[in-house]
């Protein structure tokens, strides 16, 4: 019938939504303006199928922690050293559709920086005295603990291991982290103090910086920001390091606290 010919399959609208992010409400409105109707039931059916696929892909299961040492406090030494002699306090096996089987290791102390504040975690390896090397492909945070991710367990778990952070990778991350602060200051200097950092993602390859501003930057603004950042890099300003500074003093000294950052 003519009414059936004017009914557009929901699968077509879902492809627009899923692939290009085109809102289904807008698709429906455009179709209605042209005398067509969207089969919203079949659209919702496709949406549920996609949600189910995503749920299954994200399925992850954790084995219980296997505790080797009763040592609940973990020390981070990675600001001063990229190597440390460590013991494995506990470990567990994790299964997921995405990564297969991996292991999570907790050390009594660690030079590995765990993913935090938009900065990715360190990578590297641990090595035993008998030459057993296990690669650490990520470091994440769970509560106050740094957790080290690896594809394999060491052959012997009760040894002392030399934990080594990939120094070149860490240095690239540090450079990009510093660049976010330079960029933030450049934006505030050039666009105004209303600019606030809304989020960031810092890796060894690049960084993303999200910020608030009331309009799109024009080319002259972009060039000014680039010149500001590049001039500070070329000046090679000495770093003044301060640790464990009270919040009030840090803010009085000009630190900008962005506690809602993601």
Residue ranges of each PLM-predicted region?
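A glycine- and charged-residue-rich anion-binding loop/surface
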Residues: 1-262
């Amino acid at each position: 019938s003519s009414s059936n010919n004017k009914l557009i399959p929901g699968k077509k609208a879902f492809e627009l939504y899923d692939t290009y992010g085109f809102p289904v409400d807008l698709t429906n409105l455009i179709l209605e303006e042209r005398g067509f109707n969207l089969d919203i039931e079949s659209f919702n059916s496709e949406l549920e199928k996609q949600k189910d696929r995503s749920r299954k892909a994200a399925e992850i299961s954790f084995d219980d922690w296997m505790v080797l040492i009763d040592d609940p406090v973990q020390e981070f030494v990675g600001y001063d050293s990229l190597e440390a002699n460590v013991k494995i306090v506990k470990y567990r096996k994790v299964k997921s559709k995405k990564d297969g089987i991996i292991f999570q290791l907790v050390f009594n102390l660690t030079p590995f920086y765990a993913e935090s504040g938009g900065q990715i975690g360190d990578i590297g390896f641990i090595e035993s005295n008998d030459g057993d090397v296990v690669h650490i492909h990520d470091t994440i945070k769970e509560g106050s603990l740094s957790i080290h991710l690896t594809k394999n367990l060491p052959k012997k778990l009760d040894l002392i291991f030399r934990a080594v952070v990939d120094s070149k990778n860490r240095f690239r991350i540090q450079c990009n982290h510093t660049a976010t602060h330079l960029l933030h200051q450049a934006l505030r200097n050039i666009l105004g103090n209303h600019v606030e950092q809304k989020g960031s993602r810092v890796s060894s390859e690049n960084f993303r910086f999200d910020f608030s501003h009331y309009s799109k930057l024009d080319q002259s603004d972009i060039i000014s920001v680039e010149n500001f950042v590049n001039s500070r890099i070329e000046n090679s300003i000495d770093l003044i390091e301060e640790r464990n500074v009270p919040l009030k003093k840090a803010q009085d000294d000009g630190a900008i606290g962005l506690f809602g950052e993601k």
